[in-house]
Amino acid sequence: MGFPIPDPYVWDESFKVFYQLLDDKHKQIFQGVFDCAKDPSSAAKLQKLIEVTAKHFSDEENMMQQSKYSGYPPHKKAHEEFLGKLRGLRAPLDTAGLDYCKDWLVQHIKTIDFKYKGKL
């Protein structure tokens, strides 16, 4: 059992990684998951979530590479696995798919992302 899933599903200060670009992208991903949960039949909202997530992962990985962050390889692998699963989802989204996305994002930020605080 990991960190609790916020309800309503919104970003709050407890998710802060202290890099403005990354915090802003995390907020956008939270909003994307929230929007998909609100309208699970919308393929457009799912596609936007995928695009925002892919862009964020790219930005975050670039920062890790530039700073020579030692945790980069497993972090990138986690991103690739999640993005693969996200791209495999189809609208209408079922509860299991939405719950997976919600839980993954919370656990990823609070465990894996928090490891790079102060190192990028």
Curated annotation (Swiss-Prot):
PROSITE patterns named in the record: HEMERYTHRINS (PS00550)
Residues that, per the record, bind Fe cation 2: 60, 75, 79, 108, 113
Protein name (database record): Myohemerythrin
Family statement drawn from the similarity comment of this UniProt entry: Belongs to the hemerythrin family.
GO molecular function, one term: oxygen carrier activity
Matches recorded under PANTHER family: BACTERIOHEMERYTHRIN
Keywords: Iron, Metal-binding, Muscle protein, Oxygen transport, Transport
Annotated signal peptide: none
Highest taxon, organism lineage: Eukaryota
Organism of provenance: Sipunculus nudus (Sipunculan worm)
Cysteine disulfide partners in this protein: none
